[in-house]
Amino acid sequence: MAQILLHGTLHATIFEAESLSNPHRATGGAPKFIRKLVEGIEDTVGVGKGATKIYATVDLEKARVGRTRMISNEPVNPRWYESFHIYCAHMAADVIFTVKIDNSIGASLIGRAYLAVQDLLGGEEIDKWLEISDENREPVGDSKIHVKLQYFDVGKDRNWARGVRSTKYPGVPYTFFSQRQGCKVTLYQDAHVPDNFVPRIQLADGKNYEPHRCWEDIFDAISKAQHLIYITGWSVYTEITLVRDTNRPKPGGDVTLGELLKRKASEGVRVLMLVWDDRTSVGLLKKDGLMATHDEETANYFHGTDVNCVLCPRNPDDSGSFVQDLQISTMFTHHQKIVVVDHEMPNQGSQQRRIVSFIGGIDLCDGRYDTQYHSLFRTLDTVHHDDFHQPNFEGGSIKKGGPREPWHDIHSRLEGPIAWDVLYNFEQRWRKQGGKDLLVRLRDLPDIIIPPSPVMFPEDRETWNVQLFRSIDGGAAFGFPETPEEAARAGLVSGKDQIIDRSIQDAYVNAIRRAKNFIYIENQYFLGSSYGWKPEGIKPEEIGALHLIPKELSLKIVSKIEAGERFTVYVVVPMWPEGVPESASVQAILDWQRRTMEMMYTDIAQALEANGIEANPKDYLTFFCLGNREVKQEGEYEPEEHPEPDTDYIRAQEARRFMIYVHTKMMIVDDEYIIIGSANINQRSMDGARDSEIAMGAYQPYHLATRQPARGQIHGFRMSLWYEHLGMLEDVFQRPESVECVQKVNEVAEKYWDLYSSDDLEQDLPGHLLSYPIGVTADGSVTELPGMENFPDTRARVLGNKSDYLPPILTT
C-alpha cells in the first residue's frame, strides 16, 4: 500500500488486548489460569522467566511514536487504557500497534495490528478491535487489540501559519508548565558586550535596541542575593571571573566565581549547586578532544565549605531494561544551565525580595567568555590568557599560542511568575538527587520573598508572556505522577513505566507550525527526523533520531511553495561539533547532519519541481557557520612553544583562521516568538529521557507580526545578531522571508567563505557569517564543494563519515 503523509496530530488510545498467546514460552498457548499459575511459581522460586510484562507501542511505519506502561501478571488480557497526543510528520501506509513482552535485555514480539492511514484522513474517530498478526501478517490465534484513533490534519489547525495571532494566545498545549503573563525577559548575545558594539536598530515606539551583558548581570545577581543562590550546570568552573572588561570595572569584580560563591554562603545565603557527574561517556569521547567538565575539581573545591555542591549523575528512571539503564547513566548528561537568586525589588527602598532566574546555553565555566568580536589571537595576553580554550587540537595550549576557539552563545534572564517555574524545576531536581533537604522554605518567608506575581503591568508595551519547557524524566525530577492518566493531565508523556517531560520538542513543533514568514535558528547541532533519511549505507529505523524538527521545517517550506508564498529558514551551526574534527565521533555527527540536510533539501526540490518553479533550494533553506580570520598585529602575544609540524594546529595558526564555535540553542519565528534554552537540535536534547534540558518560549503581546512586521525586542535581538555575524545592517534584513534578503545574506556569506578559505590574507575578515561549505543540487542532493572535501587546515571531511563502532544513540 502506498505511503501517505500524516502531518498533524494523532490522538490515540490503546484500551486492551484479548486472547494473547506467547510463542516464546512452552505454556504460551495454555489457558489463562495455567499460565498465571506457572508464572507465579517461577516468580516465587526465582526460576524461569517469571511474570510476563506486556506493553504495546504505536508506530508510524518504523518510527515509534508512543508506548504504554508494562502490565504484569496479565498474559492473556492486559488492560492499559492509555491515551497519546502524537505530533506526526511521517510518510506511512499504516498505523501499527505492536504488542511485546519485556525482557531484562530487549523485548520479545507477540504480534502487530495494522490500521490503514487512508482510513484516518477524513478526521473521524475510529474505535475498533484489530486482529493481531505475526511477522508474516498471519493471525496469531484469536488475539486482538482494542484501539481508538482520530487524526487532525495540520492544515485544519486554527493556528497553522497564523503566528501568535493575538495577546490571548494561550501558549503551547499539553505541557507541564503553563504560560505566564506579566513577565520581563532580557536577551543576551554572548557572555559580554563591550561598549563599542553599538548596532543602530530601530524598534517600535521610537525606541532603539540596547544590548545587555550576561555575565555582568549574573555577577550582580549573585553578589546581591540575600537568601538563596541555586545553580545547575553541565559544567561549573570555580576559577573563572565573570567581570573582565577593563572599561567596565565593578567593585569586587576580580573575584573568582568559586570565591564569590563561598563568600555568599559564609554570609548566610543558601548556595546549592547541581553539577553533572561526568562518569563515563567521557571515556569513549575524551580521546576525541572533548573538554573536561571539572566536576571533580569543583566538588573538591567546595568540600568542607558552606557551599553545597552535589555531583549529579544522569540516573535512569526505575523502569528501563538493564541495557537502557546502562545507556542513560553512561551516555547522557544533565545539560540544564540555570541560576536562580532572590533579588531586590525594582523600587530600591523595599525590604521585600523577588525571584530572578537565568537560563540559556552558557555554562559558568572556562572557554565561555567572549564578545561579538570573537578574536582568535588578540586577547591571548589579556582576558583569554588564563582562559585559553582549544579542544579541537591535540595539545592545544596557551604556551603554543592561538588560534583559541571563540565561543558564540545566547542566554536570558527571566523575571516575574516565569522565574518561579525555573525555581520549581530546581527544587524538583534537588529533591530527587540533591540528598539533604537544604532548600530554602520560601513559605516561611512570606513577608520577605513575595509570591509569584507580575513584574509588568498588562498595559505596559514591554511586557512579555513566557512559558517554560523541559526535557527531563522521573529519574531526574521529584514528584512526577505515577500513572499515565495523571501524567497526561500534567502535560507529561508516559511510556513503559517512564514519565517524561518532552515539552521542548513540543514547543519547537508548535512554533514551526505557527510560523508565517521566516525562521532563524542558531544551534550547536542540527540532526534528526531520521525516519525520513535516505537508506544509503544505513537502516534509518536503527538510528533512532526520531524528533520532528527538521521534517517540520521542510514541510513548512513545502506548504508555502504549494501556496505560492515566500518562506525562508536560516540555520547557523558550528563548522563541526567541538572536538578533533577527524575523530570518529565528530565525523559521525557530520554524517547525520548531512543526511538531515539532504532529506530537507530533497523535500524542497521535489516541491519546486511539482509546482513548476525554477529556483535554488537555498533560496528557501540555507545553512551557515561562523569563522574568523585575523592579520597579525604588532605587539601581539608571542607563544613560547610551537605546535607540532604538519598538524591542524600549526596549519590554522599559520593561516590565522578558525571557526567560531556556535553553542547557541535558539529559534526566532517571524521576529515575534523566541525559544532560548540548553537544548540542541538532536535526539539527546529533544528525547526527554536522554539529556536533561530546560528552555523558554516567549513573545511580547504588543509586538506581534499580525498586520505589520513585529518590531519589539525579539526583532532587535535578531538584527543585533545579524550585525554581529555580517558586520553590517541592510534595510533588506528587515524582511528575512524575501528572496532579496536571503540572496543578499547568501551572497555575503559566500564572499566571506571565499575570504576565509583563501590562501591569501590581506585584511581581517569583515564579518563572521560563512556559507556552510556544501553544494546543493537541483534534486536536493548535498555534495562537496569543488576542491573542498575537507575543512580548511584539516583532513576532516565536511560531509562526515559513518562510524562503524560508535552506536548511533551516542552521536545522535
Swiss-Prot record:
Cofactor(s) listed: Ca(2+)
Residues holding a 1,2-diacyl-sn-glycero-3-phosphate: H335, Q524, H663
Protein name: Phospholipase D alpha 1
UniProt-annotated binding residues for Ca(2+): D190, H374, H408, E724
Active site: H335, K337, D342, H663, K665, D670
Reaction(s) catalysed (UniProt annotation): a 1,2-diacyl-sn-glycero-3-phosphocholine + H2O = a 1,2-diacyl-sn-glycero-3-phosphate + choline + H(+)
Domain called PLD phosphodiesterase: residue spans: 330-368, 658-685
Annotated keywords: Calcium, Hydrolase, Lipid degradation, Lipid metabolism, Metal-binding, Repeat
Gene coding for it: PLD1
C2 domain: residues covered: 1-130
MF term (GO), any: calcium ion binding
Protein role: Hydrolyzes glycerol-phospholipids at the terminal phosphodiesteric bond. Plays an important role in various cellular processes.
Assembly description: Monomer.
InterPro entries: C2_dom (IPR000008), C2_domain_sf (IPR035892), PLipase_D/transphosphatidylase (IPR001736), PLipase_D_C (IPR024632), PLipase_D_fam (IPR015679), PLipase_D_pln (IPR011402)
Family: Belongs to the phospholipase D family. C2-PLD subfamily.
Keyword Transport attributed: no
GO CC terms: plasma membrane
A Gene Ontology biological process term: phosphatidylcholine metabolic process
EC number: 3.1.4.4
Domain notes: C2 domain is a calcium-binding fold, and the binding promotes the protein association with membranes. A lower affinity toward calcium can be anticipated for PLD alpha due to the absence of two potential calcium ligands.
SMART domains: C2, PLDc
